[in-house]
């Protein structure tokens, strides 16, 4: 089996896929960590060369083979970045590669009549929003950093405390939540709204208070 192992962390979709899969393992979603079996490559369909350990994760509609490496913080395993393998229960010989968060979420759906399917669809939409917003904010981060370099200034050159706080608030906004995969999503915002209100763009706008 020819496998795609070159997943780039700079691509928003692949970055989000990594965060999602690691969160599924960490939070033990559908028994991902507690009910799965750690096996060697000889047991995996196609006998891939890498990595050495895979989780045989049995789900309602089939088996998801998850390639992992040992982890040291908050979870025993983490995704190796190699493509997962989906083996449907009704087609034991028909396997397919899974390397995108939408494919992973589709594997979790029990059946078309299960309530979880709608919830997973909603979350998939949130992930798409997070991917889009991440790409847009990444462009602004590169533009802002380039502007700072050309100006030859840093936060130390800001005389007022309020200016320094806003500077660091903007800088922190480019960092993701440490654990929630799709935290980058600002639901209901398009690119114009992000530029007008999101802290990544350091906008100025009038507050409208409700008493």
For the regions a language model picked out, list residue spans one by one.
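Noncatalytic N-terminal accessory/assembly modules of large enzymes
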Residues: 1-210
């Amino acid at each position: 089996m020819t496998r795609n192992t070159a997943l780039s962390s700079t691509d928003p979709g692949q970055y989000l896929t990594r965060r999602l899969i690691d969160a599924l393992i960490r939070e033990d979603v559908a028994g991902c960590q507690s009910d799965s079996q750690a096996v060697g490559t000889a047991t995996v369909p196609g006998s891939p060369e890498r990595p050495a350990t895979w989780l045989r994760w049995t789900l309602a509609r089939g088996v998801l083979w998850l390639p992992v490496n040992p982890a040291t913080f908050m979870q025993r395993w983490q995704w190796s970045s190699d493509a997962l393998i989906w083996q449907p229960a009704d087609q034991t010989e028909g396997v397919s590669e899974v390397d995108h968060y939408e494919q992973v979420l589709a594997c979790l759906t029990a059946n078309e009549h299960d309530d979880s399917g709608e919830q997973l669809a909603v979350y998939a939409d949130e992930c798409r929003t997070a991917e889009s917003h991440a790409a847009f904010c990444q462009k602004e981060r590169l533009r802002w950093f380039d502007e700072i370099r050309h100006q030859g200034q840093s936060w130390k050159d800001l005389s007022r405390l309020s200016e320094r706080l806003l500077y660091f608030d903007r800088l922190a906004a480019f960092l993701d939540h440490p654990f929630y995969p799709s935290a980058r999503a600002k639901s209901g915002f398009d690119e114009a709204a992000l530029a007008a209100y999101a802290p990544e763009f350091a906008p100025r706008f009038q507050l409208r208070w409700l008493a």
